[in-house]
Amino acid sequence: MCVWREEQMGFYGRWILPQVIQLTMRQKNFAPFQEHTAGAAHGRVLEIGIGSGLNLASYHPDIETVCGVDPSAELLAKARDRVANVGFPVRLLEASSEKLPLENRSFDTIVMTFTLCSIPDPDTALLEIRRVLKPEGELLFAEHGRAPDSDVMHWQDRITPIWKRIGGGCHLNRKVDVLIQAAGFRLERLSAGYQKFAPRPFSFF
């Protein structure tokens, strides 16, 4: 899910971009990443960038609760339509991930799927995520980011300034693993590679 600043909320940002995001995230190529990530959550769950709530169907029915945060009122309205179809409590908050209105150490699992690429200040957001995560909690994520090959990196760097303007702030070239570790997290499991369904600058997941 993409996250963008209020100043990006012109007609395109408020009405067209949410539809584009929802249609993109509903593509079958993204489903395995979303299902695997959300399906591993447990206990009290916080989803950063819940968007239209597509991940709600992938959570295990035995989880305690899901709190979903997103800055887009338009996408959250779509998420509310999906809440009735799940068997666990869901709380939806219109808020920035850089300033979470949540208590310290209050979640067992935090989930992000295709969100960190578009958070305006990912360093601050990750520190906030660490603040609200319990000491033994888990951060589960599926993200796209900077490729390891220099020729692909070159194109990611060239495309990103334009892409982020039309893609809700999405950066193709963020070093996701570096950002997460810089916030104090320890990476226990990480798999990454190029996906076949999109050009390489867009598909290093």
Locate the predicted segments by residue.
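A short glycine-rich, Lys/Arg-flanked "PGG" loop and its adjoining helix->strand segment in the class I
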Residues: 123-135
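A short SAM/SAH-binding and catalytic strip from SAM-dependent methyltransferases
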Residues: 108-121
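Conserved alpha-helix/loop element of class I SAM-dependent methyltransferases that forms part
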Residues: 24-44, 54, 58
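Local beta-strand N-terminus motif with an aromatic residue
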Residues: 42, 107-108, 185
